[in-house]
Amino acid sequence: MGMKPKMLVLINSSTGLYDFRNELLSELSKSYCIVVSTPDSGKIDLIKKLGCEVIITPIDRRGINPVVDLKLINNYRKIINKEKPDYILTYTIKPNIYGGFLARVKKINYAVNITGLGTTFQKDGLLQSIVTKMYRVAFKKANVVFFENIENKNIIVNKKIVPDSKCCVLNGAGVNLDRYSYLEYPVDCKTTRFLFIGRVMQEKGFDELYTAMQRLVDGGFDCKLDVLGSYEEDYKKKIDSAVEAGWLSYYGYRNDVRPFIEKSHCFVLPSWHEGMANTNLECASSGRPVITSNIHGCKEAVLDGTTGYLCESQNIDSLYECMKKFITLSYQKRKDMGKAGRKHMENFFDKRIIVDSTIKNLK
């Protein structure tokens, strides 16, 4: 048997790659020797266990310092020259731009993944026009550009970054229905436990959630909020005071969120923008109702009124009304919502279907 072709995967977080795409890596490693370049060591041991080689490459994820980025391009160039990959697969903005550009220049087959357009495309401005131009250059010769929702694809096509024929929209990374198996709904009790999983930051809608919770508690509704995820420093005071008031429990980042999903009644993610919110999928797959924003990347996961509720993004009143509506539901109705959510995941978000579809489109 001849040598397997080599695939280079460029990403900005080993944790994100492993948590959401380990099944894809396993499947790809049957046909390719895989080398992963990542800036962090978070989950590299687990990635190596899948049979991949790992190279640590520093990336300033949010900075826009050209000197730092030139260093990244140079590091990528060295890796490509040394590894001589047959295919390059990139995720997230900097790997997409610089990896895509180098693959194009070196005439290597490549595919890019738009896992969300972030704040850059929320408002017109200099940064948006620079990124648009960079995307155009970097994606020009891509074999395929993957998207996690239709709106992101339409933005990229309308800006004439890539033609529609090169685009492939997947339902995010999908959800592993076995790992996130149906969990029995918690026994009927008078306190409603809401759950938030994600980075505690403005763009995840945490401020709206905090205010809505406070309003519910002040209004005499018996509810609590469990928060999982790291927080940005300016939220410390807020979290501490809610913990002290007794309506919020903070657990930090957790590798395994399933025990927290199990004891929750409802998951809430009032995000401002998402590629495809994995946490919505995981909680729905586990049989929990979901309240989330009525935006692309969130709303696909919910059948409004059947598996949860959709609220307006960046709108405290709308979120408050949805949460209040949920609190007043009967135990049976909540349980039925959770079951319907599980069914919706089985029908449209099964990770196996998404992995197969990704591989089929890489050709």
Model-derived features with residue positions:
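A conserved mid-protein helix/loop that constitutes part of the nucleotide-sugar donor-binding site
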Residues: 18-23, 192, 196-215, 317
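Short, structured helix-loop element that forms part of the nucleotide-activated donor/catalytic region
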Residues: 44-50, 215, 219, 224-247, ...
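Donor nucleotide-sugar binding/catalytic pocket of nucleotide-sugar-dependent glycosyltransferases
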Residues: 55-56, 136, 140-182
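Acidic anion/phosphate-binding donor-loop and adjacent secondary structure
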Residues: 64-68, 157-158, 172-191, 259
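Aromatic "clamp/platform" in nucleotide-sugar-dependent glycosyltransferases that forms part
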Residues: 253, 272
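Short hydrophobic beta-strand element within catalytic cores of glycosyltransferases
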Residues: 289-292, 302
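Conserved acidic donor-binding segment of nucleotide-sugar-dependent glycosyltransferases
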Residues: 304-305, 309-316, 325-331
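A short, well-ordered alpha-helix in the C-terminal region of glycosyltransferases
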Residues: 318, 325, 332-347, 357-360
